UniProtKB/Swiss-Prot annotation:
Pfam families: Pep_deformylase. Its cofactor is Fe(2+). This is Peptide deformylase. It is an enzyme of class 3 (hydrolase). Fe cation binds at C99, H141, H145. InterPro entries: Peptide_deformylase (IPR023635), Peptide_deformylase_sf (IPR036821).
Amino acid sequence: MIRRLEYYGSPILRKKSSPIAEITDEIRNLVSDMCDTMEAHRGVGLAAPQVGKNVSLFVMCVDRETEDGELIFSESPRVFINPVLSDPSETPIIGKEGCLSIPGLRGEVFRPQKITVTAMDLNGKIFTEHLEGFTARIIMHETDHLNGVLYIDLMEEPKDPKKFKASLEKIKRRYNTHLSKEELVS
């Protein structure tokens, strides 16, 4: 089932997600719905807060990146429950990022080239992976969502900050019609 996305201005995008203690049918259904939602919106990753759930979980459809930068997509989306990042490489690189919760905008963000992630899969098995390049960037971006951080908090100053801010306000008003003005946050 495709779920409604939460957009910039929704308070859940600014909250730290709760760890998942047990993999229940509710969590399995959430993962299935998140995969459907990510695919419907043509995303490469999606965190639970982006579909209104404050739990530490994200899905991703990229398996890895080749040496020449080609993305290898997974047969089925990959699940990361309670992810923990470690061992970031020292030299950051800049790359463009976008977000399904901030449609139409992109920004340049410095992130480590390499990262290690330890998480649990949908079967409850703990795994550790060493990732680099765009795949590592996706992992860091989605993990940021679980901590209430958006890429716009980390990005380099946009070329036209006033126009960028106006675009954010437009997203806040256009996509959050289910929220009252008092509920909206930046």
